[in-house]
Amino acid sequence: MFDVESLLKKLNVSEDKKENILQKEQLKKNLETLYTNFDTDNKLLFTLACTAPKKIDILIFGILINENVIKNDATLRASMKFAIKNTDVTYEELKDFILKNTKSKEEVSEIINKACLSGKSKKEVYIILKNKLPFEDSKYLMDEVNKFEIDTSKSKKVKDWLEEGEVSMLHKPGDNPQLNEKILKDHLERTGGKVVTRFPPEPNGILHIGHAKAINLDFGYAEKYNGICYLRFDDTNPRNEEDYYFESIIEDVKWLGFEPYAITSSSKYFGDMCELAEKLILKDKAYICELSNEELKKRRRMLSEAFETDKDKSIEELGLILSPYRNREISENLKIFREMVEKKHKEGDYTLRFKMDIRSKNPMMFDLVGMRIIDCDHVVTKDKYNLYPSYEFALCVSDSLEDVTHSFCTREFFTRQESYKWLLDALEIYKPVQWEFSRLNISNTVLSKRKIVPLKKYGIELDDPRLYTIKGMRRRGIPPQAINNFVKSLGITYAETIIDNKKFESFIRDELNKTTQRVMCVMDPLKIYIRNAKEQEISIPNSNQKIIFKPYIYIEKSDFKMEDDDKDFLRFTPNQSVGLYMFGAIKFIKFDNDMIIAELTNETPKKFIHWVSCDSIKVTIRLYDPLFRSFNPEEGNYLDNINLDSLKTVVGYCDDRIKGCEVEDKFQFQRVGYFCVDPDTTPENIVFNRIITLI
């Protein structure tokens, strides 16, 4: 009989993980399926068992791992994505997909060498390689990059945003004051004096450009000082959390080019938080309250308004009671709390509240809720708990348990500093320092999940290229390095402003100009027959590529004018020749059934234009404009401000250089703009998204 525990022991799985695995029936089934059929020493099978979506046939993947076709985590992730998109995929189809996308050692070496000699920084090179070699192991790529002495003298210098302003003068590890010397000494022994940061998203939505600023700060600060950064999920509200959001956030962070030291979650510490809550009760720093949420909010509001009116009076003088349960006996509090932990009460019966210093008159010190019952299973802990810590409890304790030295958060958390410090001192545990920075607000869009979700009724999903979600920007074709450079260019400030999206666009163009291949594409075709021309091969300058010229071509309708009434129009007219890029000049002969008859000429043209042969590749092109008409859609009802013409779809014709393109490949369509291959692409129809215009 299959013994899961023996297998986990053999694989050296930690006790925490083992306990979590043993609660998951599907995961145990996966392990049994794989390890009774294949080599029990292969740890990649364990990764497959833990990460496989229900939709895929894990036996097919197990066979491919066993045959060494799937060799690493990166190939496994990419092939699982393929299987999800292509339901009922066969062994042969999946194997063919992997082999087609797996580069030879020589090809990988060539791509790495070229990237490392590009003049970009190591981080930029790593991002390029991750995108070009998605089937290669991340650690291998980073090791290869680190072997190179990379010369960045060719690259555009970006100022070090962490060496300007207050962020450059933050405390060093060990300089942040603690309740006593022992706490500080123990902390430094655990960390070795390293900088420790964390990025703590809630897994209830997807990341956007504002998060990219926080990610760059959290990971960048740790990297600058040779420290570590955790990716920690703040998963304290099981009703709003989904597996998809956990996976999506990890994918987005890595796509931006950052590797967490470890991926953790507040739920990892739920047991510790129950013990710490008992400690607070025993110290008379917490109590069990029976007030409803509505009554609790009402009393907090009344107290806040009373302090505003009579600033010098105490709560006793005001005659207000925050909670009639505030002075409940410690033994009674402890008894009820233990019953809550044991699931003997239902949602709404009780909450654990901190017994804080109300004299501070800061609303964030009005006995915040520390733990509450939510009758809902958790994505990670399943049905182990129904008592969950509040955000205020979980963030502080998780920061402390992970020995975070610099706890970065946006400025609206400034009022929470006092409660943050109070709680950790009350618990007599290590206390990180919080430091606030301004949110990133960008023009012509909305960023919050609360405002993005209602856009669904307009057909706008979370990954819509018009949104500034990480998924949306990636789908549109915006390079991760452009996002990183943009947010770093803004610096770290406390003042909140709305940044014009045109500033962001300049970073996008700068990056795409350096990295995209130029091709020709005609989107509003006018047919021309060049009657004295012959089919021929044309070599592309500075490239080993060639395209075929044929006498029947398309040009843009806007490049031809029948009237000669505009002296500033220097392109094609009945009396003015025009140059065809990489070919030669043509002159107008006549119109024939909506087609121009032309001839090659030796005249020197005033302008050259792009063109394609009439049998070029037909493609679908999506032209995106800002989703909202106004600079700040937040003013008034943002839904009334939607630009209903922000997406136009046209048919275009591209030259043969796009053959073999893959999803997320990017091109510059000469004289038109930058475009990216969309996931809606099929073998029969390539779909392009316009990333941005040339100017």
Curated annotation (Swiss-Prot):
Q: Where do the annotations place L-glutamine binding?
A: 234, 391
Q: Tell me its family.
A: Belongs to the class-I aminoacyl-tRNA synthetase family.
Which SUPFAM superfamilies does this chain map to? Answer: Nucleotidylyl transferase (SSF52374), Ribosomal protein L25-like (SSF50715)
- Which PANTHER family has this protein been placed in? GLUTAMINE--TRNA LIGASE (PTHR43097:SF4), GLUTAMINE-TRNA LIGASE (PTHR43097)
Motif 'HIGH' region mapped to chain = 201-211
NCBIfam families named in the record: glnS (TIGR00440)
Q: What is the species listed in this Swiss-Prot or TrEMBL entry?
A: Vairimorpha ceranae (strain BRL01)
Which Gene3D superfamilies does this one have?
HUPs, Ribosomal Protein L25, Chain P
Residues annotated for ATP binding in this entry: 202-204, 208-214, 410, 439-440, 447-449
Location of the motif 'KMSKS' region: 446-450
Q: Which reaction does it catalyse?
A: tRNA(Gln) + L-glutamine + ATP = L-glutaminyl-tRNA(Gln) + AMP + diphosphate
Check the record and name the Pfam families matching this protein.
tRNA-synt_1c, tRNA-synt_1c_C, tRNA-synt_1c_C2
The enzyme's E.C. designation:
6.1.1.18
Q: Which taxonomic lineage does the organism of this UniProt entry have?
A: Eukaryota, Fungi, Fungi incertae sedis, Microsporidia, Nosematidae
Q: Which InterPro entries match?
A: aa-tRNA-synth_I_CS (IPR001412), Gln-tRNA-synth (IPR004514), Gln/Glu-tRNA_Ligase (IPR050132), Glu/Gln-tRNA-synth (IPR000924), Glu/Gln-tRNA-synth_Ib_cat-dom (IPR020058), Glu/Gln-tRNA-synth_Ib_codon-bd (IPR020059), Rbsml_bL25/Gln-tRNA_synth_N (IPR020056), Ribosomal_bL25/Gln-tRNA_synth (IPR011035)
GO cellular-component terms in the record? Answer: cytosol
Q: List GO molecular-function terms, semicolon-separated.
A: ATP binding; glutamine-tRNA ligase activity
Q: Name the chain's protein.
A: Probable glutamine--tRNA ligase
| Keyword set, alphabetical order | Aminoacyl-tRNA synthetase, ATP-binding, Ligase, Nucleotide-binding, Protein biosynthesis
What biological-process GO terms show up in the record? glutaminyl-tRNA aminoacylation
